[in-house]
Structures are given as structure tokens and as C-alpha cells.
């Protein structure tokens, strides 16, 4: 029976899920929670390596993760220490993450395609003591590792001075140290720019991730219904919280199989779906777009897929319709997340065990065991249904805060526990959430975050640039791409290509600036804030160089 979804609390209008609250075992460490029902699916496939079809059973994954915990401990990793996982999707990513959880240690995940400077910045900020990576990426941390006595573990070949991952697996799992993990201890430290500024470490706790996974897959009528006969396609990078949480951790909790793809390749992707009878496809809009546009799709039987979920960026109605035609038996819907929110705030109720009707373009309904409100960004007053305002969420799933940044934490989470998302949306009469705009400054390139402030800091470092602002430009393939408005220094003749080259040498591919517009001044408010609205309006009006 749907519960009452709207209440008033000290003047605030609060929205809750149509699904009733459930018991969540928040006292359990994350690994204990994920493997709580292990005996039911010990011998079932847990990880399927798409590269070589190697299958790891649940028993093997649990045992290997404990061995890795002991191996990490022998290399000096103690409770509350941080390891950096610098890997594409692979079984070792899973063993390392779960192994660290067993120790009460913290995993910070970084994109292996980051530049050396970006990797080192995160390793330093997170105080990582070990980096787990592939040989081809080890060079990115080589100098930093030597200077800071950092151990580098490689999962494939072993460059000089590195340790092979197999050494961790040779440990005796019975030697695992006895650690007392508290629910509020941090287990994952992804980096996010939040609503503004430079990337910051987001402290996600055991209790927070347990709560978030439970909100999705636990309960008699689970919001995201999955079971041990399901096969999930894990093509989204596990270093991204959406994949780590809604694919890996949710699947482990229910005993489903996880088909791991290192990277998205449409032909291999389409071959793997019928080969392994994939049933659940968690995607992002660029993958949905590739499926909708690929002529190859019609050559493959995709009838095994029963759920297609899209997140990380909004999906337009046309794209929804186009992809629906490609998956004849699938329910298609969206979720809405933000790293700081743990990450899932809303999930499509068409995915529930007892599904609800949903509207096209909605990004779900607030998850159970949580509260949502919509506030006027100027006054902070809560707003009724159908009125757009800033989306705020409260619940045990949200982050503990930003690492070593109490000011940014206080700007994001109110004293009453409300997390401000920086996204503008409204809740309609059927409790469905629609995103209409972003207060926050982030650019979303194919679902990846690009922080304008990070690119602006690099641009302003160039001697021929006196000021700069970066804003998103709409792009059919990527959703948004970063473009720069640049003020040349006196006498400078720097060109668009020179600016683009200067940036592309310092950042990962998706942060590269796609267009440069030279301007006399960057518009700013009296307090010095860049007026990005004005720059976006100039783009929309068709600015010319």
C-alpha cells in the first residue's frame, strides 16, 4: 500500500517515497552487508570477465577479497588508511575495494586516464599509501611514489619497483586483523566538484553505502528489483560512484552476476548481451545514444534485457523512445544521483518488483527511508508540488562531508541534515521528480563531471591570458562540452589552437576545451563571481569570435 508521500515539518513541505520505509541493517560493515546472504549463492557466478569469459563465483570473490585484505595489511595498510584504485573495470578492482573494506580502510578511486598531475593531486589530497593500477598507468605515479614511499601494485605485468597483485592473493585469509568498524567510518572516497569549485574528497561511510544499496534493492517490493538469476552489464567505470554503488554493490547484495567490460565498445557490447543473457543494463546517455544510432543493433538478440536504467545526466524523450524500440522486453527509466548524496536520490518506480506507471522524462521518485524537499534558491523556503526549486535530500545515505574541508561541507549540508544538490527540479502530482536546470556550475560531458573552476585555474596560469571563464556548450554527442571565454594579456596574440593545446596537455580528454572565444572582459558580479548565465546566454544567441 503506498504511504502518505507528503508531510509538513516545521514549515517545510517534505516528500517521501511511495514505497514504505524498511529495516536497514546500518550497524553492519559494507562487506558484511553485501555478503550477508552469501550461503544462498556461494557457487553462483559473481564476476564474469568480459575480456576472457573467466567466471568467479561468490565464494571465490569473498575469499579472494579477504586474502587481499591480509595482503594489504602485510604491506602496512591499517584501519582508516587510504588506498588508491587506479584501474579500469576488472575483477581486481572489486577484490581491492572489498578487501580494503574488510580492513576498515578507505578506497579512493581515480580515472586511470587522468594525467599524471591529476592522479598525483588526488593521491596527495587523499593521503593514499598504496596505488593499485595497471603497468601502463604506473608511470603516472612513479616519481610521487619514490618521493613519498608509496607502494605501487600492478595487476598485470610488473614494472621495476612495483609489486604484483598476485602477491596479495597468496596471503592466508585467516590472518585478517580483528578490526572494529563503526557505522560512521569512511569506506569510499570518490572525488567530486560538488556544486562548485575544485574536486573534493567525498566521505562515504559504511552506514551511508549500506543505506543507499538497501534503499534500492532491499525490501519486499524493492525499488530496483534484481535477484540472483540476473546478469548486470558493468560497462560504466567502477571508479564512478553510480557504477560502484548501483551496479557492483547492489548486485553483490542480491547475488546477481556482474559482467565486467573494461570499456565501452559497441560491437563487443552487443555480442556480450546475448552471449551472457544480460538482464539489467545500467547506462548513461552517451551509451544510450550509441545504441539508438548503431546499425549493428538489429543484428543482435537483445530480448534478455528486462531493465534499462540511465543515470548521470538527463535523458531526452526522443532518446528514450529510440532506445525503447531496441530492447523489446525492457522497462526503461531513469535514476537521479549525486556523489555527495551517496549517490542515489531518486529511482524510477517502473523498476520496482511491483511496478508503478511512470512518465517519460521523469528521473524517478525519491528513494525510501529518505526525505526530499524543493526550496526556493533565493529565500530557502520550501515549495509545493509542480514548482521548480533546488532539490534537497536528507537521510543516512548522504556523505559524512568533504575530506578536510569543513567550509565546503557546511555550504552543502545544513545543520538540520539537508544536502543541497545545486540541481533545479520539481515534484509533480504523482511524486515524480523532473530536473529542469542546474544551479551548480558543473559541466556534464557524457556523464563525467568537468569543473569550470579547475580549467579556469589552468587557463589563468598562462602568461598570455589575463582572465578566463569556462561554461558548457550544448553538444549532441556529449550532452555538454567545455568552452572558454578568454581575455588576452596586453600585447598577446595567443590563438584558439594554442589555448586548446595548452589545456589538453594537462587534463583528461573529457576536460579538453572545445572552443575558445576571445573577449574584452569576463562578466562578473559585484562580489567577483563569474556571471556564467550571461555567457551561456551569449552562446545560445550564437556568439561569433
From Swiss-Prot:
It holds the Pfam family AMP-binding_C. One of its GO terms (molecular function) is 4-coumarate-CoA ligase activity. Its cofactor is Mg(2+). InterPro entries: AMP-bd_C, AMP-bd_C_sf, AMP-binding_CS, AMP-dep_synth/lig_dom, ANL_N_sf. ATP binds at residues 192-196, 200, 334-335, 339, 423, 438, 529. Residues 265-334 are annotated as: SBD1. It catalyses: (E)-4-coumarate + ATP + CoA = (E)-4-coumaroyl-CoA + AMP + diphosphate; (E)-4-coumarate + ATP + H(+) = (E)-4-coumaroyl-AMP + diphosphate; (E)-4-coumaroyl-AMP + CoA = (E)-4-coumaroyl-CoA + AMP + H(+). CoA binds at residues 263, 446-447. (E)-4-coumaroyl-AMP binds at residues 242, 246, 312, 334-335, 339, 347, 440, 444. Keywords: ATP-binding, Ligase, Magnesium, Nucleotide-binding, Phenylpropanoid metabolism. Pathway: Phytoalexin biosynthesis; 3,4',5-trihydroxystilbene biosynthesis; 3,4',5-trihydroxystilbene from trans-4-coumarate: step 1/2. PROSITE patterns: AMP_BINDING. Its EC number is 6.2.1.12. It is an enzyme of class 6 (ligase). Residues 335-402 are annotated as: SBD2. Belongs to the ATP-dependent AMP-binding enzyme family. Both substrate-binding domains (SBD1 and SBD2) are involved in the substrate recognition, and are sufficient to confer the substrate specificity. Carboxylate--CoA ligase that may use 4-coumarate as substrate. Follows a two-step reaction mechanism, wherein the carboxylate substrate first undergoes adenylation by ATP, followed by a thioesterification in the presence of CoA to yield the final CoA thioester. This is 4-coumarate--CoA ligase 1. The gene is 4CL1.
Amino acid at each position: 500500500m503506498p504511504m502518505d508521500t507528503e508531510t509538513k515539518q516545521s514549515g517545510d513541505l517534505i516528500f517521501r517515497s511511495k514505497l514504505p520505509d524498511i529495516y536497514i541493517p546500518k550497524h553492519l560493515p559494507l562487506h558484511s552487508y553485501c555478503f550477508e546472504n552469501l550461503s544462498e549463492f556461494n557457487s553462483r557466478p559473481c564476476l564474469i570477465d568480459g575480456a576472457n569469459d573467466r567466471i568467479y563465483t561468490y565464494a571465490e570473490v569473498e575469499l579472494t577479497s579477504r586474502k587481499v585484505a591480509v595482503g594489504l595489511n602485510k604491506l602496512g595498510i591499517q584501519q582508516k588508511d587510504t588506498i588508491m584504485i587506479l584501474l579500469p573495470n576488472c575483477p581486481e578492482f572489486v577484490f581491492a575495494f572489498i578487501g580494503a573494506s574488510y580492513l576498515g580502510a578507505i578506497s579512493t578511486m581515480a580515472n586511470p586516464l587522468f594525467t599524471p598531475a591529476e592522479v598525483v593531486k588526488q593521491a596527495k589530497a587523499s593521503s593514499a599509501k598504496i596505488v593499485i593500477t595497471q603497468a601502463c598507468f604506473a608511470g603516472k605515479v612513479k616519481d610521487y611514489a619514490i618521493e613519498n614511499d608509496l607502494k605501487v601494485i600492478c595487476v598485470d605485468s610488473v614494472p621495476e619497483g612495483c609489486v604484483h597483485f598476485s602477491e596479495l592473493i597468496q596471503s592466508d585469509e585467516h590472518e585478517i586483523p580483528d578490526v572494529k568498524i563503526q557505522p560512521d567510518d569512511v569506506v569510499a572516497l570518490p572525488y567530486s566538484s560538488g556544486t562548485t569549485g575544485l574536486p573534493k574528497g567525498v566521505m562515504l561511510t559504511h552506514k551511508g553505502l549500506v543505506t543507499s544499496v538497501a534503499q534500492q534493492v532491499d525490501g519486499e517490493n524493492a525499488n530496483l528489483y534484481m535477484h540472483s538469476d540476473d546478469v548486470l552489464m558493468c560497462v560504466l567505470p567502477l571508479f564512478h560512484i553510480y557504477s560502484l554503488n548501483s551496479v557492483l554493490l547492489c548486485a553483490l547484495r542480491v547475488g546477481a552476476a556482474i559482467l565486467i567490460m573494461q570499456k565501452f565498445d559497441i560491437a563487443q557490447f552487443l555480442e556480450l548481451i546475448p552471449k551472457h543473457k544480460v538482464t539489467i543494463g545500467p547506462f548513461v546517455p552517451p551509451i544510450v545514444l550509441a545504441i539508438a544510432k548503431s546499425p549493428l543493433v538489429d543484428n543482435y538478440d537483445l530480448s534478455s534485457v528486462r531493465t534499462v536504467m540511465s543515470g548521470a545526466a538527463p535523458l531526452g524523450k526522443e532518446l528514450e523512445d529510440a532506445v525503447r524500440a531496441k530492447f523489446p522486453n525492457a522497462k526503461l527509466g531513469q535514476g537521479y544521483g549525486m556523489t555527495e548524496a551517496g549517490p542515489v536520490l531518486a529511482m524510477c518506480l517502473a523498476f520496482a518488483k511491483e511496478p508503478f506507471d511512470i512518465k517519460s522524462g521523469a528521473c524517478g521518485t525519491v528513494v525510501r527511508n529518505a526525505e526530499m524537499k524543493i526550496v526556493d534558491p533565493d529565500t530557502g523556503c520550501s515549495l509545493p508540488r509542480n514548482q521548480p526549486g533546488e532539490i534537497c535530500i536528507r537521510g543516512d545515505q548522504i556523505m559524512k562531508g568533504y575530506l578536510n574541508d569543513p567550509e565546503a561541507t557546511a555550504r552543502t549540508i545544513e545543520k538540520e541534515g539537508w544536502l543541497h544538490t545545486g540541481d533545479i527540479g520539481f515534484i509533480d502530482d504523482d511524486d515524480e521528480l523532473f530536473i529542469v536546470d542546474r544551479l551548480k556550475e558543473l559541466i556534464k560531458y557524457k556523464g563525467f563531471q568537468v569543473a569550470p573552476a579547475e580549467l579556469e585555474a589552468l587557463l589563468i596560469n598562462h602568461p598570455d591570458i589575463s582572465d578566463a571563464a569556462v561554461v558548457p556548450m550544448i553538444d549532441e554527442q556529449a550532452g555538454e562540452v567545455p568552452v572558454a571565454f578568454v581575455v588576452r594579456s596586453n600585447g598577446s596574440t595567443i590563438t584558439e589552437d594554442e589555448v586548446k593545446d595548452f589545456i589538453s596537455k594537462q587534463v583528461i580528454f573529457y576536460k579538453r576545451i572545445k572552443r575558445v572565444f576571445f573577449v574584452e572582459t569576463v562578466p562578473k558580479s559585484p562580489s567577483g563571481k563569474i556571471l556564467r548565465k550571461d555567457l551561456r546566454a551569449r552562446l545560445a544567441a550564437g556568439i561569433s569570435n
